[in-house]
Amino acid sequence: MAGHLVNYGKHRTRRSYARIKEVLELPNLIEIQSNSYQWFLDEGLREMFDDIMPIDDFAGNLSLEFVDYQLLEPKYTVEEARQHDANYSAPLHVTLKLTNHETGEIKSQDVFFGDFPLMTDQGTFIINGAERVIVSQLVRSPGVYFNSAIDKNSRTTYGTTVIPNRGAWLEFETDAKDIAYVRIDRTRKIPMSVLVRALGYGSDQEIIDILGDNDSLMLTLEKDIHKNTDDSRTEEALKDVYERLRPGEPKTADSSRSLLFARFFDAKRYDLASVGRYKINKKLSLKTRLLGQTLAETLADPDTGEVIAAKDTVVDRQVMDALAPYLDCEDFKAVTYQPSDEGVLPEPMTLQVIKVYSQKTPDKEINLIGNGHIDAKVKHVIPADIIASMNYFFNLQEGLGSTDDIDHLGNRRIRSVGELLQNQFRIGLSRMERVVRERMSIQDTSTVTPQQLINIRPVVASIKEFFGSSQLSQFMDQTNPLGELTHKRRLSALGPGGLTRDRAGYEVRDVHYTHYGRMCPIETPEGPNIGLINSLASYAVVNRYGFIETPYRRVSWDTHDVTDKIDYLTADEEDNYVIAQANSPLNDDGSFVDNTVLARYKDDNIETSIDKLDYMDVSPKQVVAVATACIPFLENDDSNRALMGANMQRQAVPLVNPHAPLVGTGMEYKAAHDSGIALLAQHAGTVEYVDAKVIRVRREDSSLDTYELMKFRRSNAGKNYNQRPIVAKGDHVDVDEIIADGPAMEKGELALGQNPLIAFMTWNMYNYEDAIVLSERLVKEDLYTSIHIEEYESEARDTKLGPEEITREIPNVGEDSLKDLDEFGIVRVGAEVKDGDILVGKVTPKGVTELSAEERLLHAIFGEKAREVRDTSLKVPHGGGGIIQDVKIFTREAGDELSPGVNMMVRVYITQKRKIQVGDKMAGRHGNKGTVSIVVPEEDMPYTPDGTPVDILLSPMGVPSRMNIGQVLELHLGMAARNLGIHVATPVFDGAQDKDLWDAVREANMPSDGKSILYDGRTGEPFDTRVSVGVMYYMKLAHMVDDKLHARSIGPYSLVTQQPLGGKAQFGGQRFGEMEVWALEAYGAAYTLQEILTYKSDDVVGRVKTYEAIVKGEPIPKPGVPESFRVLVKELQSLGLDMKVLDIDNQEIELRDMDDDDDDVVNVDALSKYAKEQEEKKAQQEAEKAQAASAEDPSAE
């Protein structure tokens, strides 16, 4: 027997066909969220306050400093926040110190900074009672980038861009004449030498000394002549720069100096962030640039004079290892230049310079200039960075250095929750800083306290805006646990500061070789977002700079064996190494079986000898994301179908009684465990008590843990989230062990569907075009039954005419409609309701007409209640019937927080039990989707020789053209597993081979071709050919026919065109479009067409009259003019065209305006009759009133 047994949790054992030993556990799958948020609480917040503070007033008398902050206990628990539609957040308190420099007085105070949303243990936020996820963003990393292009003369031109995290861009470029130019913040270009002069290096000779002899530089200096001899070269340069940045303003050297300082050298306005400084230092340091170059000078130890590398040496890895410690020294090959006093910065500039030979003209010496040793704390650019990047730019023309690929994952980084929050918080704090400064100058300095200076409104508003309306703060996809998990691991290139759908080209969306082990090449949406929204690969982690790292096993340089030492590499580090594939055959001691192996180097797949190897992949599944790793036989599926398979697993509806797949990949347990939906034991211990609602575990230190299970909770997607215990009394549990299954889980594993018996055969054309033929057994035995919970709410508000009232006394409603309401008018739990039934009885006061003086007097005397009310009850919408599961009532008296003007709110939960039916969408894990076309009685389905009827019939035509052969392999292996009574695991790219599959088939005593004779259930005759029959995992998806079925007779109309609205949500009609009109014209159905275009659409008068005629039983009158035609006429008239409409006799037809005179819309006779009746009724009431009054008060006579 091939394969070996592996335990997944304590409740499931699978036969695994994996050949490769797992050397590394998968990381916690939601740590990208939790780690990032934890960093924000621990460091990010403090960093923010340190950046903004201290705040000084304009005169320099007061200064406000940050001391410390703390988060207090949250007001609500997670569950309470859900119930009360509140935020799960904690109050943030900041300790501030105000120093008065005039008196030396110091005041410290604790200031409340608003409520800060907290992350739940599941990696989500509760905002206004709804669970939200902050999606991580993929953005271009700050740093220095070099690019090349080919101009119209077929010459290669180079460009350089220094991109900060925030601040002005700096760009270098050359023109057709090879003159080098600089652009500051996308303005007009100036010669490069002008910028160097402005930094305080005025003469041509100084510039040549610094940057070295270069053709392009010489041409640039020739162009840059001294125009105004009254100014020094530096002053003239400063004025030139100012003129480009602020055209039209009077230019002086001083204003230019302060402007340049503010643009680039002021940490408050220009920020590279730690990642930008890291990238610039890495790109410009000589360590990376010397590799592969030929030295044009001898490098010696500055202390001993010992030669490290002689002239004409080519710097390879070994030479670099010897040089590296020296290159890290501050003074090794360091050159310091002192700028003139007129420059922007007075500080001297230190560079690291080494001479090498040009690649293009090998005898030409070139300076390699590094930016020296700049501290990681310096978050703005300094002159050394600018000079070193200019040098890199010039050296590119000599063939030294390399250009950058912007889609390389070494140049794209991830902004996770913590950083996104930090950026938002910074915006709020900087707005607050302005307010504080203004208040400092207004308030009395002797009595002012920190509390009086601080206005927290901008901070609170920016946080609220981020969680409520940012493109990256999303309503969590809660269809099933896999959907949740994937949503938390999603990477989006969209959002603020990112790309937009319309402008993103093909290159950005494409799979890049650096995605390997970092981002899944398969899981991405179909449609306009393809390639812009990705998923983190299963083993990938995000480092402190936001770059994605993936783990590799180190290969020993001496023995060339694979060690168990794991290194995490970013994409640009990986470019230096040769990496063997995970499935390279190994001996038990870690040595390679063969002398040559398949490996990767940059974007090449190469066959190489083992002495060239540096690393080896950790696992075959490190390439793909979690959802993709759940597809067995992925290697046998076409990638387009695998993409659909991965995406559709997220849409599987949690079933009432799910089963884990017989053919899994071993990923099901980990996905369920980390999704946050299973209940995990927080401490080890022994189970003392279990029921459906609570589990009690006695810890080893004798204290008791009580776990409450989630019962029938509505998820964000309206699915039923319910937990079931899987431990028994007396069981011992470990820390982090699953003690209760969540939705779509079974025995601690992900269970998105069922394992039905499936045959690939046609059946009376019912499975044409991917349709699915189902056996009635699946309906009867509730295999694909799911529970859906919908929430409806009704609010009683204060109106101008008085408060609304929730009551059972509803006008014009019979007792029959009120049978399920209690005495307050609220539906009882357990009642069965259907469309249109009342859930909450509510009446709203009607507008009263203006009363005459006499009537007002009568009102004042008798205080009688003639105020009318109208029925505004909450009713069950179309298709929303079911059983009332729960009713929640919120009132002010009970201490619930309600929005202003609301006196009472009632929330009703309706549960529907949906069996699978014709029209529902189903799918396997290989992108094999279809809709149910017929449900066949069990006895009519084809059956196997042992009499077992098949559950599902799929069309065999769906396999060859789609190239998802994985489903056929799964079918055979699934059948073998079912017959053997086992579960199997076949991990992606390392699963069951052909031989394993057929061995299992033989072991299960199945026919050697895996096929079976099938008999027709209706006639008992065998079908002609043998049919592939087996077990395949099949899911019911969230696209259910119940949610889509819709019909309308009358309903709402659009305001302008008066045509019916569209769509189920608006209760709209079906669009009868241009082509449908042609069809009826061609058929000659003139009357049908006429009524579709008039009565049934937008002939306002016609539809009212038609209704009257139908009610009275009269013939239907002729249609009038459609409203949309009137709109068209009005539009033409608005263009100044005098358009008239003529009839057949050339007489003008009057087009009335809707608002002028609506006589013909409403029946005038009926209206006058109604008015007369009302008047008579009123007179009668007044007479009765007068009579009653005289009866009570005889003296009135």
UniProtKB/Swiss-Prot annotation:
It is an enzyme of class 2 (transferase). Pfam families: RNA_pol_Rpb2_1 (PF04563), RNA_pol_Rpb2_2 (PF04561), RNA_pol_Rpb2_3 (PF04565), RNA_pol_Rpb2_45 (PF10385), RNA_pol_Rpb2_6 (PF00562), RNA_pol_Rpb2_7 (PF04560). Gene3D superfamilies: 2.40.50.100, 2.40.50.150, 3.90.1100.10, DNA-directed RNA polymerase, beta subunit, external 1 domain, DNA-directed RNA polymerase, subunit 2, domain 6, RNA polymerase alpha subunit dimerisation domain, RNA polymerase Rpb2, domain 2. Residues 1172-1185 have a biased composition (Basic and acidic residues). NCBIfam families: PRK00405.1, rpoB. HAMAP family: RNApol_bact_RpoB (MF_01321). This is DNA-directed RNA polymerase subunit beta. It comes from Latilactobacillus sakei subsp. sakei (strain 23K).
